[in-house]
């Protein structure tokens, strides 16, 4: 049986990249469990322990095929999976601001083997002192959950990603993945 994309799938395409392979529900659930754990850590213990959780995160078993995707296809997959990561975030932290949104997306995509990173930045010209900092998620330098121009108005303070995922992508090698 041939997999048919929904009629609205063109809205999620970031380029003319080929369609990524579908993500089985079992992998989505495992990635969502990691996202829920990470969100609880962020809520209860703050950014320090939460960003260490992301750095130490290992992709879930079965995610090798997504880690090997070329960047345009991986970005397209990431855009298609945003709903799942944000569903977990909306359940656990309905009023979560940019850090919670970006963090949940980065954890979810990293669990799928994509080298997504959370970017924390300071506004260059503060219009509102209450919101002088901002956060977004990036994959291969492309902003996933904000306007692409956000990179121009902020000075990056910190970029956090899953060390194993980023190292594997940089080295172009496969690393054995730990199971939970």
Place the predicted regions along the sequence by residue.
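A short, contiguous structural element within a folded domain that forms the immediate neighborhood
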Residues: 77-84
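Hydrophobic/aromatic-rich core segments of domains that either
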Residues: 84, 103-180
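Short coil/turn segments at secondary-structure boundaries
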Residues: 72, 93-96
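Long amphipathic N-terminal alpha/beta scaffold segment
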Residues: 68-69, 75, 105, 112
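A generic helix-loop boundary/linker signal
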Residues: 74-75, 127
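N-terminal accessory/pre-domain segments preceding catalytic cores
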Residues: 1-67, 84-94, 111-112, 120, ...
């Amino acid at each position: 049986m041939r997999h048919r994309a929904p009629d609205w799938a063109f809205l999620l395409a970031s380029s003319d990249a080929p369609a990524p392979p579908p993500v089985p529900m079992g992998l989505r659930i495992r990635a969502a469990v990691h996202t829920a754990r990470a969100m609880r850590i962020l809520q209860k213990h703050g950014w320090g322990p939460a960003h260490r959780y992301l750095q130490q995160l290992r992709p879930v078993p079965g995610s090798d095929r997504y880690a090997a995707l070329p960047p345009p296809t991986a970005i397209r997959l990431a855009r298609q999976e945003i709903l799942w990561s944000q569903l977990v975030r909306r359940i656990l932290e309905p009023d979560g601001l940019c850090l919670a949104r970006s963090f949940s997306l980065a954890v979810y995509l990293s669990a799928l083997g994509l080298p997504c990173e959370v970017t924390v930045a300071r506004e260059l010209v503060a219009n509102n002192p209450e919101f002088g900092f901002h956060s977004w998620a990036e994959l291969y330098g492309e902003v996933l959950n904000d306007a692409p121009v956000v990179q121009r108005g902020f000075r990056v303070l910190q970029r956090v990603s899953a060390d194993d995922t980023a190292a594997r992508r940089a080295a172009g090698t496969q690393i054995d993945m730990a199971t939970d």
